[in-house]
Protein backbone atom coordinates (compact mmCIF):
# COMPACT_ATOMS: atom_id res chain seq x y z
CA UNK A 1 0.00 0.00 0.00
CA UNK A 2 1.37 3.44 -0.93
CA UNK A 3 2.06 6.03 1.76
CA UNK A 4 -0.79 8.21 0.41
CA UNK A 5 -3.27 5.32 0.44
CA UNK A 6 -2.15 4.33 3.94
CA UNK A 7 -2.69 7.89 5.14
CA UNK A 8 -6.16 7.92 3.56
CA UNK A 9 -7.05 4.62 5.24
CA UNK A 10 -5.87 5.96 8.61
CA UNK A 11 -8.03 9.06 8.16
CA UNK A 12 -11.08 6.90 7.44
CA UNK A 13 -10.42 4.83 10.58
CA UNK A 14 -9.99 7.99 12.66
CA UNK A 15 -13.22 9.43 11.28
CA UNK A 16 -15.13 6.22 11.96
CA UNK A 17 -13.82 6.08 15.52
CA UNK A 18 -14.72 9.70 16.17
CA UNK A 19 -18.21 9.28 14.72
CA UNK A 20 -18.72 6.16 16.84
CA UNK A 21 -17.79 8.11 19.97
CA UNK A 22 -20.14 10.94 19.04
CA UNK A 23 -23.02 8.55 18.40
CA UNK A 24 -22.46 7.01 21.81
CA UNK A 25 -22.74 10.48 23.35
CA UNK A 26 -25.97 11.07 21.44
CA UNK A 27 -27.32 7.75 22.68
CA UNK A 28 -26.65 8.88 26.24
CA UNK A 29 -28.54 12.10 25.57
CA UNK A 30 -31.47 10.12 24.19
CA UNK A 31 -31.57 8.10 27.41
CA UNK A 32 -31.86 11.37 29.31
CA UNK A 33 -34.80 12.31 27.08
CA UNK A 34 -33.35 15.60 25.78
CA UNK A 35 -31.33 14.84 22.63
CA UNK A 36 -32.48 17.84 20.56
CA UNK A 37 -34.10 20.52 22.76
CA UNK A 38 -36.10 23.23 20.99
CA UNK A 39 -36.95 25.65 23.79
CA UNK A 40 -33.80 27.82 23.88
CA UNK A 41 -34.18 31.41 22.65
CA UNK A 42 -31.39 33.85 21.91
CA UNK A 43 -31.75 37.61 22.00
CA UNK A 44 -28.61 38.72 20.14
CA UNK A 45 -26.30 37.59 17.35
CA UNK A 46 -22.54 37.98 17.53
CA UNK A 47 -22.36 40.83 15.03
CA UNK A 48 -25.02 42.75 16.95
CA UNK A 49 -23.02 42.36 20.15
CA UNK A 50 -19.76 43.47 18.55
CA UNK A 51 -21.40 46.45 16.85
CA UNK A 52 -22.99 47.65 20.08
CA UNK A 53 -20.34 46.87 22.68
CA UNK A 54 -16.87 46.52 21.13
CA UNK A 55 -16.14 50.20 21.67
CA UNK A 56 -17.05 50.17 25.35
CA UNK A 57 -14.39 49.95 28.04
CA UNK A 58 -14.23 46.98 30.43
CA UNK A 59 -15.28 49.08 33.41
CA UNK A 60 -18.28 50.48 31.55
CA UNK A 61 -19.44 46.99 30.54
CA UNK A 62 -19.14 45.78 34.11
CA UNK A 63 -21.18 48.70 35.38
CA UNK A 64 -23.90 48.10 32.77
CA UNK A 65 -24.26 44.45 33.90
CA UNK A 66 -25.69 43.31 30.54
CA UNK A 67 -27.18 39.81 30.34
CA UNK A 68 -27.36 38.25 26.87
CA UNK A 69 -28.46 35.00 25.28
CA UNK A 70 -26.62 33.60 22.23
CA UNK A 71 -26.56 30.38 20.24
CA UNK A 72 -24.27 28.90 17.61
CA UNK A 73 -21.71 26.29 16.68
CA UNK A 74 -18.72 25.56 18.94
CA UNK A 75 -15.69 26.12 16.71
CA UNK A 76 -12.84 26.09 19.24
CA UNK A 77 -12.46 25.22 22.91
CA UNK A 78 -9.56 25.71 25.31
CA UNK A 79 -10.04 23.79 28.55
CA UNK A 80 -7.86 25.08 31.39
CA UNK A 81 -8.88 23.04 34.39
CA UNK A 82 -11.88 24.63 36.05
CA UNK A 83 -12.42 27.20 33.29
CA UNK A 84 -12.54 27.21 29.49
CA UNK A 85 -12.80 29.57 26.55
CA UNK A 86 -15.11 28.72 23.63
CA UNK A 87 -15.45 30.34 20.21
CA UNK A 88 -19.12 30.31 19.23
CA UNK A 89 -20.03 30.95 15.58
CA UNK A 90 -23.44 32.13 14.37
CA UNK A 91 -24.81 33.86 11.28
CA UNK A 92 -23.18 37.15 12.24
CA UNK A 93 -19.69 35.90 13.02
CA UNK A 94 -18.05 34.77 16.27
CA UNK A 95 -18.20 35.58 19.96
CA UNK A 96 -16.07 34.24 22.80
CA UNK A 97 -17.59 32.44 25.78
CA UNK A 98 -15.92 32.18 29.17
CA UNK A 99 -17.10 28.98 30.87
CA UNK A 100 -16.21 28.48 34.55
CA UNK A 101 -17.15 25.35 36.48
CA UNK A 102 -18.28 27.19 39.60
CA UNK A 103 -20.57 29.58 37.68
CA UNK A 104 -22.68 26.80 36.15
CA UNK A 105 -25.20 24.47 37.81
CA UNK A 106 -23.52 21.53 39.54
CA UNK A 107 -22.29 18.85 37.15
CA UNK A 108 -22.76 20.83 33.94
CA UNK A 109 -19.08 21.65 33.46
CA UNK A 110 -17.51 18.23 34.08
CA UNK A 111 -20.33 15.86 33.19
CA UNK A 112 -21.68 17.71 30.16
CA UNK A 113 -19.63 20.58 28.73
CA UNK A 114 -16.25 18.81 28.79
CA UNK A 115 -17.78 15.85 26.92
CA UNK A 116 -19.18 17.97 24.10
CA UNK A 117 -17.36 18.15 20.75
CA UNK A 118 -16.32 20.82 18.29
CA UNK A 119 -19.15 21.36 15.84
CA UNK A 120 -21.85 20.90 18.47
CA UNK A 121 -24.48 23.64 18.57
CA UNK A 122 -24.81 25.36 21.94
CA UNK A 123 -27.01 27.89 23.66
CA UNK A 124 -25.39 30.21 26.20
CA UNK A 125 -26.58 32.86 28.64
CA UNK A 126 -24.41 35.16 30.67
CA UNK A 127 -22.98 38.62 31.30
CA UNK A 128 -20.91 40.62 28.84
CA UNK A 129 -17.36 41.49 29.85
CA UNK A 130 -13.97 42.12 28.32
CA UNK A 131 -10.91 39.96 28.85
CA UNK A 132 -7.50 41.35 29.79
CA UNK A 133 -6.67 41.45 26.07
CA UNK A 134 -9.80 43.52 25.41
CA UNK A 135 -11.87 40.84 23.68
CA UNK A 136 -15.63 41.09 24.10
CA UNK A 137 -16.82 37.88 25.77
CA UNK A 138 -19.75 36.32 27.61
CA UNK A 139 -19.28 35.02 31.16
CA UNK A 140 -21.65 32.05 31.03
CA UNK A 141 -24.16 31.26 33.76
CA UNK A 142 -26.14 28.82 31.61
CA UNK A 143 -24.86 26.51 28.87
CA UNK A 144 -26.90 23.95 26.94
CA UNK A 145 -26.27 21.49 24.14
CA UNK A 146 -28.89 22.13 21.45
CA UNK A 147 -27.69 19.84 18.64
CA UNK A 148 -25.15 17.03 18.81
CA UNK A 149 -22.91 16.98 15.71
CA UNK A 150 -22.20 13.39 14.67
CA UNK A 151 -19.43 14.32 12.23
CA UNK A 152 -16.36 16.41 13.03
CA UNK A 153 -15.62 19.76 11.47
CA UNK A 154 -13.43 19.62 8.34
CA UNK A 155 -9.75 19.28 9.12
CA UNK A 156 -10.24 20.21 12.77
CA UNK A 157 -11.38 23.74 11.84
CA UNK A 158 -8.53 24.45 9.42
CA UNK A 159 -11.08 24.58 6.64
CA UNK A 160 -11.81 22.69 3.46
CA UNK A 161 -8.72 22.49 1.28
CA UNK A 162 -10.36 20.50 -1.54
CA UNK A 163 -12.15 22.81 -4.00
CA UNK A 164 -14.46 20.02 -5.16
CA UNK A 165 -15.50 19.34 -1.57
CA UNK A 166 -16.27 23.03 -1.07
CA UNK A 167 -18.84 22.93 -3.87
CA UNK A 168 -20.26 19.48 -3.15
CA UNK A 169 -20.63 20.10 0.59
CA UNK A 170 -21.31 23.82 0.64
CA UNK A 171 -22.59 23.58 4.22
CA UNK A 172 -19.07 22.64 5.37
CA UNK A 173 -17.58 25.43 3.27
CA UNK A 174 -19.91 27.94 4.91
CA UNK A 175 -19.08 26.65 8.39
CA UNK A 176 -15.33 26.88 7.92
CA UNK A 177 -14.74 29.64 5.36
CA UNK A 178 -15.34 33.28 6.28
CA UNK A 179 -14.69 34.41 2.70
CA UNK A 180 -17.35 32.09 1.32
CA UNK A 181 -19.92 33.25 3.88
CA UNK A 182 -19.18 36.88 3.06
CA UNK A 183 -19.51 36.20 -0.68
CA UNK A 184 -23.05 34.92 -0.29
CA UNK A 185 -23.99 37.68 2.12
CA UNK A 186 -22.82 40.15 -0.51
CA UNK A 187 -24.84 38.31 -3.15
CA UNK A 188 -27.95 38.72 -1.02
CA UNK A 189 -27.25 42.44 -0.59
CA UNK A 190 -26.80 42.84 -4.35
CA UNK A 191 -30.16 41.20 -5.06
CA UNK A 192 -31.86 43.36 -2.44
CA UNK A 193 -30.16 46.43 -3.91
CA UNK A 194 -31.33 45.61 -7.43
CA UNK A 195 -34.91 45.22 -6.27
CA UNK A 196 -34.78 48.50 -4.36
CA UNK A 197 -33.27 50.28 -7.38
CA UNK A 198 -35.91 48.92 -9.77
CA UNK A 199 -38.95 49.52 -7.57
CA UNK A 200 -37.78 53.10 -6.92
CA UNK A 201 -37.96 53.67 -10.70
CA UNK A 202 -41.48 52.40 -11.08
CA UNK A 203 -40.77 48.81 -12.14
CA UNK A 204 -43.01 45.95 -11.04
CA UNK A 205 -41.46 42.56 -10.21
CA UNK A 206 -43.21 39.64 -11.92
CA UNK A 207 -42.79 35.90 -12.43
CA UNK A 208 -43.08 34.08 -15.74
CA UNK A 209 -43.08 30.36 -16.65
CA UNK A 210 -40.00 28.25 -15.98
CA UNK A 211 -41.37 25.44 -18.16
CA UNK A 212 -42.29 26.46 -21.68
CA UNK A 213 -43.77 24.74 -24.71
CA UNK A 214 -41.57 26.86 -26.97
CA UNK A 215 -38.21 28.03 -25.57
CA UNK A 216 -37.36 31.54 -26.66
CA UNK A 217 -35.73 34.82 -25.78
CA UNK A 218 -32.14 33.72 -26.43
CA UNK A 219 -29.99 31.63 -28.72
CA UNK A 220 -29.12 28.54 -26.68
CA UNK A 221 -29.68 24.79 -26.42
CA UNK A 222 -32.56 24.06 -23.99
CA UNK A 223 -33.15 21.28 -21.49
CA UNK A 224 -36.11 19.08 -22.41
CA UNK A 225 -38.54 17.56 -19.92
CA UNK A 226 -41.89 15.79 -20.24
CA UNK A 227 -45.26 16.67 -18.72
CA UNK A 228 -46.93 13.33 -18.01
CA UNK A 229 -50.49 14.58 -17.54
CA UNK A 230 -50.43 16.49 -20.82
CA UNK A 231 -48.18 13.94 -22.55
CA UNK A 232 -46.19 16.91 -23.79
CA UNK A 233 -42.50 17.67 -24.14
CA UNK A 234 -41.63 20.96 -22.48
CA UNK A 235 -38.48 23.02 -22.13
CA UNK A 236 -36.83 24.63 -19.15
CA UNK A 237 -36.67 28.26 -20.07
CA UNK A 238 -33.53 29.74 -21.56
CA UNK A 239 -34.86 33.28 -21.00
CA UNK A 240 -38.08 34.99 -19.84
CA UNK A 241 -37.96 37.67 -22.54
CA UNK A 242 -40.94 36.80 -24.71
CA UNK A 243 -43.26 36.41 -21.72
CA UNK A 244 -42.14 39.70 -20.20
CA UNK A 245 -42.82 41.52 -23.46
CA UNK A 246 -46.28 39.95 -23.57
CA UNK A 247 -46.85 41.73 -20.24
CA UNK A 248 -45.83 45.05 -21.78
CA UNK A 249 -48.36 44.40 -24.56
CA UNK A 250 -50.88 43.83 -21.77
CA UNK A 251 -50.18 47.24 -20.25
CA UNK A 252 -47.55 46.60 -17.57
CA UNK A 253 -45.17 49.22 -18.90
CA UNK A 254 -42.22 48.60 -16.57
CA UNK A 255 -41.56 45.03 -15.48
CA UNK A 256 -38.58 43.06 -14.22
CA UNK A 257 -37.86 39.50 -13.14
CA UNK A 258 -34.98 37.97 -11.20
CA UNK A 259 -34.97 34.23 -11.65
CA UNK A 260 -33.23 31.12 -12.96
CA UNK A 261 -32.55 30.36 -16.61
CA UNK A 262 -31.38 26.97 -17.89
CA UNK A 263 -29.10 26.29 -20.85
CA UNK A 264 -27.95 22.81 -21.84
CA UNK A 265 -24.39 23.83 -22.55
CA UNK A 266 -20.88 23.45 -21.20
CA UNK A 267 -19.66 24.14 -17.68
CA UNK A 268 -16.73 26.53 -17.20
CA UNK A 269 -15.45 29.19 -14.81
CA UNK A 270 -18.08 31.52 -16.33
CA UNK A 271 -20.91 29.12 -17.19
CA UNK A 272 -23.29 27.02 -15.10
CA UNK A 273 -26.24 25.20 -16.69
CA UNK A 274 -28.66 27.01 -14.37
CA UNK A 275 -27.94 30.63 -13.62
CA UNK A 276 -29.66 33.75 -12.36
CA UNK A 277 -30.67 36.63 -14.63
CA UNK A 278 -32.39 39.92 -14.12
CA UNK A 279 -34.45 41.02 -17.12
CA UNK A 280 -36.37 44.27 -17.39
CA UNK A 281 -38.60 45.87 -19.98
CA UNK A 282 -39.41 49.56 -20.16
CA UNK A 283 -42.08 51.00 -22.46
CA UNK A 284 -41.53 54.33 -24.21
CA UNK A 285 -37.76 54.00 -23.95
CA UNK A 286 -34.90 52.96 -26.22
CA UNK A 287 -31.54 51.26 -25.76
CA UNK A 288 -29.84 54.56 -24.93
CA UNK A 289 -32.10 54.96 -21.90
CA UNK A 290 -31.04 51.50 -20.73
CA UNK A 291 -27.37 52.34 -21.17
CA UNK A 292 -27.92 55.18 -18.69
CA UNK A 293 -29.93 52.93 -16.36
CA UNK A 294 -27.28 50.18 -16.44
CA UNK A 295 -24.50 52.62 -15.62
CA UNK A 296 -26.53 54.07 -12.75
CA UNK A 297 -27.41 50.59 -11.43
CA UNK A 298 -23.80 49.39 -11.23
CA UNK A 299 -22.58 52.66 -9.74
CA UNK A 300 -25.36 52.60 -7.13
CA UNK A 301 -24.76 48.95 -6.20
CA UNK A 302 -21.01 49.45 -5.85
CA UNK A 303 -21.50 52.42 -3.54
CA UNK A 304 -24.36 50.94 -1.50
CA UNK A 305 -23.10 47.35 -1.17
CA UNK A 306 -19.32 47.86 -1.05
CA UNK A 307 -19.14 51.47 0.08
CA UNK A 308 -16.98 52.51 -2.89
CA UNK A 309 -17.12 52.85 -6.67
CA UNK A 310 -13.55 51.50 -6.92
CA UNK A 311 -14.00 47.73 -7.06
CA UNK A 312 -10.88 45.50 -6.91
CA UNK A 313 -10.82 42.37 -9.05
CA UNK A 314 -7.62 40.36 -9.27
CA UNK A 315 -4.93 42.76 -10.45
CA UNK A 316 -7.50 45.26 -11.75
CA UNK A 317 -9.61 47.94 -10.11
CA UNK A 318 -12.91 48.58 -11.87
CA UNK A 319 -13.92 52.24 -11.74
CA UNK A 320 -17.69 52.59 -11.61
CA UNK A 321 -17.44 56.25 -10.63
CA UNK A 322 -16.43 57.65 -14.03
CA UNK A 323 -18.49 57.51 -17.27
CA UNK A 324 -18.35 54.08 -18.89
CA UNK A 325 -16.65 53.73 -22.29
CA UNK A 326 -18.85 53.34 -25.38
CA UNK A 327 -17.66 51.74 -28.64
CA UNK A 328 -19.38 50.30 -31.68
CA UNK A 329 -18.53 46.68 -32.49
CA UNK A 330 -16.44 47.72 -35.49
CA UNK A 331 -14.65 50.43 -33.48
CA UNK A 332 -13.71 47.83 -30.87
CA UNK A 333 -12.33 45.49 -33.55
CA UNK A 334 -10.24 48.32 -35.00
CA UNK A 335 -9.03 49.42 -31.55
CA UNK A 336 -7.76 46.00 -30.56
CA UNK A 337 -6.69 44.83 -34.06
CA UNK A 338 -5.43 48.06 -35.65
CA UNK A 339 -4.39 46.37 -38.89
CA UNK A 340 -8.04 45.61 -39.69
CA UNK A 341 -9.34 47.47 -42.75
CA UNK A 342 -12.80 48.69 -41.77
CA UNK A 343 -13.97 48.24 -45.36
CA UNK A 344 -13.26 44.51 -45.04
CA UNK A 345 -15.90 44.27 -42.31
CA UNK A 346 -18.57 45.42 -44.77
CA UNK A 347 -18.01 42.67 -47.33
CA UNK A 348 -18.76 38.98 -46.83
CA UNK A 349 -15.70 37.56 -48.61
CA UNK A 350 -13.30 40.07 -47.07
CA UNK A 351 -14.71 39.57 -43.58
CA UNK A 352 -14.51 35.80 -44.02
CA UNK A 353 -10.85 36.13 -44.99
CA UNK A 354 -10.16 38.23 -41.89
CA UNK A 355 -11.92 35.69 -39.68
CA UNK A 356 -10.02 32.74 -41.14
CA UNK A 357 -6.72 34.61 -40.82
CA UNK A 358 -7.19 34.72 -37.03
CA UNK A 359 -8.23 31.09 -36.70
CA UNK A 360 -12.02 31.33 -36.86
CA UNK A 361 -13.76 28.48 -38.69
CA UNK A 362 -16.58 30.06 -40.68
CA UNK A 363 -19.70 27.90 -40.83
CA UNK A 364 -21.72 27.71 -44.05
CA UNK A 365 -24.82 29.09 -42.32
CA UNK A 366 -23.08 32.29 -41.20
CA UNK A 367 -23.77 35.60 -42.85
CA UNK A 368 -21.67 38.76 -42.70
CA UNK A 369 -23.14 39.85 -39.36
CA UNK A 370 -22.26 36.59 -37.62
CA UNK A 371 -18.73 36.68 -39.02
CA UNK A 372 -18.13 40.24 -37.78
CA UNK A 373 -19.48 39.27 -34.35
CA UNK A 374 -17.13 36.27 -34.18
CA UNK A 375 -14.19 38.52 -35.11
CA UNK A 376 -15.18 40.90 -32.30
CA UNK A 377 -15.39 38.02 -29.83
CA UNK A 378 -11.94 36.82 -30.85
CA UNK A 379 -9.98 40.08 -30.96
CA UNK A 380 -11.74 42.55 -28.65
CA UNK A 381 -13.84 40.97 -25.89
CA UNK A 382 -10.95 39.93 -23.63
CA UNK A 383 -9.59 43.51 -23.68
CA UNK A 384 -12.77 45.16 -22.39
CA UNK A 385 -11.58 45.38 -18.79
CA UNK A 386 -13.09 48.64 -17.56
CA UNK A 387 -16.89 49.02 -17.84
CA UNK A 388 -17.64 49.29 -21.57
CA UNK A 389 -20.77 49.37 -23.73
CA UNK A 390 -20.49 47.83 -27.21
CA UNK A 391 -23.19 48.97 -29.67
CA UNK A 392 -24.31 48.39 -33.29
CA UNK A 393 -24.74 44.63 -33.19
CA UNK A 394 -25.63 43.04 -36.56
CA UNK A 395 -29.28 42.17 -37.14
CA UNK A 396 -28.25 38.61 -37.99
CA UNK A 397 -27.22 37.92 -34.38
CA UNK A 398 -30.01 40.02 -32.85
CA UNK A 399 -33.29 38.37 -33.89
CA UNK A 400 -35.38 40.18 -31.26
CA UNK A 401 -33.83 43.65 -31.49
CA UNK A 402 -35.12 46.65 -33.44
CA UNK A 403 -33.28 47.52 -36.63
CA UNK A 404 -31.44 50.82 -36.72
CA UNK A 405 -33.33 53.53 -38.63
CA UNK A 406 -30.25 54.63 -40.59
CA UNK A 407 -28.61 51.24 -41.22
CA UNK A 408 -31.03 48.29 -41.16
CA UNK A 409 -28.11 45.82 -41.18
CA UNK A 410 -27.44 46.69 -37.54
CA UNK A 411 -29.72 46.93 -34.51
CA UNK A 412 -30.23 49.37 -31.66
CA UNK A 413 -28.51 47.01 -29.26
CA UNK A 414 -25.68 47.06 -26.74
CA UNK A 415 -23.77 44.57 -24.67
CA UNK A 416 -22.08 45.56 -21.42
CA UNK A 417 -18.60 44.23 -20.63
CA UNK A 418 -16.44 44.30 -17.52
CA UNK A 419 -13.26 42.34 -16.89
CA UNK A 420 -13.23 40.95 -20.42
CA UNK A 421 -16.63 39.28 -20.14
CA UNK A 422 -20.21 40.12 -21.06
CA UNK A 423 -22.34 41.12 -18.07
CA UNK A 424 -25.44 42.53 -19.73
CA UNK A 425 -27.33 42.72 -23.02
CA UNK A 426 -29.94 45.30 -23.95
CA UNK A 427 -31.72 46.70 -26.96
CA UNK A 428 -34.64 48.60 -28.35
CA UNK A 429 -37.23 45.89 -28.83
CA UNK A 430 -38.50 44.81 -32.20
CA UNK A 431 -42.21 45.65 -32.20
CA UNK A 432 -42.89 45.12 -35.91
CA UNK A 433 -44.87 41.86 -35.96
CA UNK A 434 -44.18 41.16 -39.64
CA UNK A 435 -40.43 41.74 -39.26
CA UNK A 436 -40.42 39.52 -36.16
CA UNK A 437 -42.23 36.74 -38.02
CA UNK A 438 -39.64 36.85 -40.80
CA UNK A 439 -36.75 36.77 -38.33
CA UNK A 440 -38.27 33.74 -36.63
CA UNK A 441 -38.43 32.08 -40.06
CA UNK A 442 -34.76 32.92 -40.60
CA UNK A 443 -33.98 31.27 -37.25
CA UNK A 444 -35.99 28.19 -38.24
CA UNK A 445 -33.96 27.95 -41.44
CA UNK A 446 -30.72 28.31 -39.46
CA UNK A 447 -31.83 25.51 -37.13
CA UNK A 448 -32.60 23.32 -40.17
CA UNK A 449 -29.11 24.07 -41.45
CA UNK A 450 -27.58 22.69 -38.25
CA UNK A 451 -27.57 25.61 -35.78
CA UNK A 452 -29.02 23.93 -32.67
CA UNK A 453 -28.94 27.25 -30.78
CA UNK A 454 -31.24 29.00 -33.26
CA UNK A 455 -34.67 30.02 -32.00
CA UNK A 456 -38.02 28.32 -32.52
CA UNK A 457 -40.93 30.04 -34.24
CA UNK A 458 -43.25 31.40 -31.52
CA UNK A 459 -46.61 32.02 -33.18
CA UNK A 460 -48.32 33.24 -30.01
CA UNK A 461 -45.63 35.86 -29.46
CA UNK A 462 -46.12 37.13 -33.01
CA UNK A 463 -49.86 37.27 -32.28
CA UNK A 464 -49.12 39.36 -29.17
CA UNK A 465 -47.06 41.78 -31.26
CA UNK A 466 -49.94 42.06 -33.73
CA UNK A 467 -51.98 43.55 -30.87
CA UNK A 468 -49.32 46.25 -30.52
CA UNK A 469 -46.17 46.45 -28.39
CA UNK A 470 -45.35 50.06 -27.42
CA UNK A 471 -41.86 51.33 -28.22
CA UNK A 472 -39.93 49.36 -25.61
CA UNK A 473 -36.38 48.70 -24.48
CA UNK A 474 -35.22 45.56 -22.68
CA UNK A 475 -32.17 44.56 -20.67
CA UNK A 476 -30.77 41.32 -19.26
CA UNK A 477 -27.98 41.18 -16.66
CA UNK A 478 -26.21 38.05 -15.47
CA UNK A 479 -26.47 38.15 -11.68
CA UNK A 480 -23.84 35.45 -11.10
CA UNK A 481 -21.23 37.29 -13.17
CA UNK A 482 -22.15 40.54 -11.45
CA UNK A 483 -21.60 38.91 -8.06
CA UNK A 484 -18.25 37.54 -9.26
CA UNK A 485 -17.12 41.09 -10.00
CA UNK A 486 -18.33 42.55 -6.72
CA UNK A 487 -16.80 39.75 -4.61
CA UNK A 488 -13.50 39.32 -6.49
CA UNK A 489 -14.45 35.72 -7.33
CA UNK A 490 -12.82 34.09 -10.34
CA UNK A 491 -15.13 31.15 -10.95
CA UNK A 492 -18.91 31.11 -11.13
CA UNK A 493 -18.95 28.15 -8.74
CA UNK A 494 -17.77 30.44 -5.96
CA UNK A 495 -20.92 32.58 -6.21
CA UNK A 496 -23.57 29.87 -6.72
CA UNK A 497 -24.44 28.07 -3.51
CA UNK A 498 -24.93 24.68 -5.16
CA UNK A 499 -23.27 24.66 -8.61
CA UNK A 500 -23.71 21.83 -11.10
CA UNK A 501 -21.28 18.98 -10.37
CA UNK A 502 -20.64 15.61 -11.92
CA UNK A 503 -21.96 12.90 -9.55
CA UNK A 504 -19.37 11.15 -7.42
CA UNK A 505 -18.92 7.56 -8.59
Swiss-Prot record:
Record-listed Mg(2+) 1 binding positions: 415, 422
Cofactors demanded by this protein: Mg(2+)
Cofactor note: Binds 3 Mg(2+) ions per subunit.
Catalytic function, reaction form: tRNA(Lys) + L-lysine + ATP = L-lysyl-tRNA(Lys) + AMP + diphosphate
Enzyme class at the top of the EC tree: ligase
Chain positions recorded as Mg(2+) 2 binding sites: 422
UniProt-listed Enzyme Commission number(s): 6.1.1.6
Gene3D superfamilies found in the cross-reference section: Bira Bifunctional Protein, Domain 2, Nucleic acid-binding proteins
UniProt-recorded name of the protein: Lysine--tRNA ligase
One Gene Ontology cellular component: cytosol
Encoding gene, per UniProt annotation: lysS
InterPro entries: Aa-tRNA-synt_II, aa-tRNA-synth_II, aa-tRNA-synth_II/BPL/LPL, Lys-tRNA-ligase_II, Lys-tRNA-ligase_II_bac/euk, Lys-tRNA-ligase_II_N, Lys-tRNA-synth_II_C, NA-bd_OB-fold
UniProt entry keywords in alphabetical sequence: Aminoacyl-tRNA synthetase, ATP-binding, Cytoplasm, Ligase, Magnesium, Metal-binding, Nucleotide-binding, Protein biosynthesis
Subunit structure: Homodimer.
Entry GO MF terms: ATP binding; lysine-tRNA ligase activity; magnesium ion binding; tRNA binding
Main location class: cytoplasm
Taxon lineage: Bacteria, Pseudomonadati, Pseudomonadota, Gammaproteobacteria, Enterobacterales
Family label: Belongs to the class-II aminoacyl-tRNA synthetase family.
Compartment list: Cytoplasm
